[in-house]
Every structure is written in structure tokens, then in C-alpha cells.
């Protein structure tokens, strides 16, 4: 249920501008850049409101919060369809940003932590397996609707889907279970470091890896072209990222679930640097290898963002803590396409030295976090 609702949430909001930006800009008389700036502003607002949304899930449970996010999504999408200029465009994405703060992965992970406690790892992995197909499923739907009924009606259709499909699915979620005080975080889980220090470290890890993820999502074909690949070859190689993400998540679900999540996170954080080094050293012949390695690491890291804090700190206060730790990652998600575009324009594939360094830094932080031997 939650996996399907998350597929709808991601596909109708986060992945929507990639399909509708050109149609929106043409009719409103603004550049596509302004469409993506409005989208980024919505992401920034979701980062600001994320901790409050997480705290609300801690107190009320996802069964009450997630359906409200569907209402907000529906309102924002309806406003987007009614947009008549740049100001109404920004207003619509601000409303959608409110919905994203309480309706995407962080909220879903917090909901599962409230329902299953420390046993939520498999459920979190399952959610990412299903919702990992959001772009695969929703991009063709949005493109077809845009061509047949127009971008405004497409927004209305997605708004209706939130009311008729997403909200009923979220209303069927189980009630959260009481979280025992014994599930509170243990100082030993961080090898004597304070909880706030570990939280800050994880926040950096998630921000660094998400910067790499969103940079590649926005610019991967161009990166591969800079390495010497033709446009057709670059697009074909970039298409391997999605299957690699899903394949890695299946591997995590069946094999790596017996290991502590920090092991998965360490491996995942090294994937992008290894792939980047391979591409820089070998050039275009390594384009497919880079896409597969990067995609696999990105797929597992998405899971780690939900399971690692749960394993280290427990389910108590998970929503608020997750919102605080993920706020920087959401910020970088909104700004990284612009920053990496500057780096790529100036340095070509040399821009991968920067993202690769971020991955190595993330691994270093994860390597400094110690867990009790009995949970490793």
C-alpha cells in the first residue's frame, strides 16, 4: 500500500518537471529555467518543514499525516494547473513543497519506524523497491497525458489520483505501536561519541551522497558525453542507472539484510568514487560501468538513509531526528544541479573529482562510526 502511494507521490511531484517543464514554460511565457527554480524553491521549503513533519508523525503516526499530504499534493497540483504566470507558478510549487515535506521517503520511513520499530528495515527496503519505479511508471504517463490532454489537465489528473488512490491507500496504514523507552539510542552505538555528533556526521553523509545522486540525475548523459561517448551511447548507458538501483536494492533485501546497515552504507558510499575513477581513467568505454556502479550505490544509499538512523538510534523520536538529519540533503538536492552544471561546464569530467571526493569523505565519516559487535 505505502509503496504504491509513494510511487504516486514521487512520480506526480519530484519527477513531474522533467516532463512538463517545456509545455509549462511555452504557455506561461517563461523560460524552463524558471520552472526548475520554482521546483527548487518547493524543495527548499520541504527541507525547512521536514523536521516539523517528522515530529508530527512521531506524535500522530503516519496514518494521520500521510493522507493530509495527499490533500496538499492535490491542492498544489490543481494550483499548478491553474497557473497563469511566474508568481502563481511559484505559489503552486510552494504548496507542493509543503506536501513533499510530509509525503515522500522521510515521512514513509518515519511511518514504518512507528509501526514496526527496529524491525522496519525490510519494509523500508520494500518501499524503495516499489517506489524506485516511480519515474519508470510516471514519466510515460505524464508524457502521454501532456500530448493528449495538455499539461494543465495532466496536473488535474495527478491531483485526482492523490484523492482517489493515494489518500485511501495511506488511510489503510496500521496504527503506530507504542515505542518503548528501551528503544532509545545507545551511546555505545557511536563508540563513545555523543548522539548529536553522530547525527551531524550522518547528516553530512546523506547530504554529500545526495549531492552526487541529484547531480548525476540531472547531468549524467552530459557527463558521459564529456568522457567521449556519443549522445546515443550516453543516453543508453545512463538508462542503466535505474535497473542498477533496483538490482542493488534486491541484493540488499535478500543478502545484506543480515548485516548491520552501516556496512551497506559504507559500501554504497564508495560506489560513486569508484565509478568516477573508472570513467576518468578509461573514458567513454567505461560509460556503462560507471552508470551501473553509481546506480547500484545510489540504490542502496537510499535504503541506508532510512535504516541506518533506525539501527543506531532506535525508533523513538525517529521522525523528528530524520527530518533534522535530512534537511541538508534536501537543500543540496535543490541546489546541486546548478552547482554541478558550473563545475561540468568548466572542468568537464574533472567535475567528478569533486563528487568523488564527497563520496570518499562520506565513507570516512561512516568508517569512524562504531557499532556494538552484537549488532554488526
Task: Go through each PLM region and give its residues.
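Extracytoplasmic
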Residues: 1-32, 49-53, 139, 214-221
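Extracytoplasmic gate region of multi-pass secondary transporters
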Residues: 13, 17-22, 195-253
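Conserved MFS/SLC helix-loop-helix module at the cytosolic interface between two early adjacent transmembrane helices
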Residues: 48-86
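Helix-to-loop junctions at the C-terminal end of transmembrane segments
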Residues: 49-61, 248-261, 344
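Intracellular juxtamembrane helix-capping segments at the cytosolic ends
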Residues: 102-116, 300-313
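Helix-loop-helix hairpin linking two adjacent transmembrane segments in secondary transporters
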Residues: 126-175
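C-terminal transmembrane helical hairpin of 12-TM major facilitator-type secondary transporters
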Residues: 241-245, 251, 259-308
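A late C-terminal transmembrane helix in Major Facilitator Superfamily
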Residues: 315-347
Amino acid at each position: 500500500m505505502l509503496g504504491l502511494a509513494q510511487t504516486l507521490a514521487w512520480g506526480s511531484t519530484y519527477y513531474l518537471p522533467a516532463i512538463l517543464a517545456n509545455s509549462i514554460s511555452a504557455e506561461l511565457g517563461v523560460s524552463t529555467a524558471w520552472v526548475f527554480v520554482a521546483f527548487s524553491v518547493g524543495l527548499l521549503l520541504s527541507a525547512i518543514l521536514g523536521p516539523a513533519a517528522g515530529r508530527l508523525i512521531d506524535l500522530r503516526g503516519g496514518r494521520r499525516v500521510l493522507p493530509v499530504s495527499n490533500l496538499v499534493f492535490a491542492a498544489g497540483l490543481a494550483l499548478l494547473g491553474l497557473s497563469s504566470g511566474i508568481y502563481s507558478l511559484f505559489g503552486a510549487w510552494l504548496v507542493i513543497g509543503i506536501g513533499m515535506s510530509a509525503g515522500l521517503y522521510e515521512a514513509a520511513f518515519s511511518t514504518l519506524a512507528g509501526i514496526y520499530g527496529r524491525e522496519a528495515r525490510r519494509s523500508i527496503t520494500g518501499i524503495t523497491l516499489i517506489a524506485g519505479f516511480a519515474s519508470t511508471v510516471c514519466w510515460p504517463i505524464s508524457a502521454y497525458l501532456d500530448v493528449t490532454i495538455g499539461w494543465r489537465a495532466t496536473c488535474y489528473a495527478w491531483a485526482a489520483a492523490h484523492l482517489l488512490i493515494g489518500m485511501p491507500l495511506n488511510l489503510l496504514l496500521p496504527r503506530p505501536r507504542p515505542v518503548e523507552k528501551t528503544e532509545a539510542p545507545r551511546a555505545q552505538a557511536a563508540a563513545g561519541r555523543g548522539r548529536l555528533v553522530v547525527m551531524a556526521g550522518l547528516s553530512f553523509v546523506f547530504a554529500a551522497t545526495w549531492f552526487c545522486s541529484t547531480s548525476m540525475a540531472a547531468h549524467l548523459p552530459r557527463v558521459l558525453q564529456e568522457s567521449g561517448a556519443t549522445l546515443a551511447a550516453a543516453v543508453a548507458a545512463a538508462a542503466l542507472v535505474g535497473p542498477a538501483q533496483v538490482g542493488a536494492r534486491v541484493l540488499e533485501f535478500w543478502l545484506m539484510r543480515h548485516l548491520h546497515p552501516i556496512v551497506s552504507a559504507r559500501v554504497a558510499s564508495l560506489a560513486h568514487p569508484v565509478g568516477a575513477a573508472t570513467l576518468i581513467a578509461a573514458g567513454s568505454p567505461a560509460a556503462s560501468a560507471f552508470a551501473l556502479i553509481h546506480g547500484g550505490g545510489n540504490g542502496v544509499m537510499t535504503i541506508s538513509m532510512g535504516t541506518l538512523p533506525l539501527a543506531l538510534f532506535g525508533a523513538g523520536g525517529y521522525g523528528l531526528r530524520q527530518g533534522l538529519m535530512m534537511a541538508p540533503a534536501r537543500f543540496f538536492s535543490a541546489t546541486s544541479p546548478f552547482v554541478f552544471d558550473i563545475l561540468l561546464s568548466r572542468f568537464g569530467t574533472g567535475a567528478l573529482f569533486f563528487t568523488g571526493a564527497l563520496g570518499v569523505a562520506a565513507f570516512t565519516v561512516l568508517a569512524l562510526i562504531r557499532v556494538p559487535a552484537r549488532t554488526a
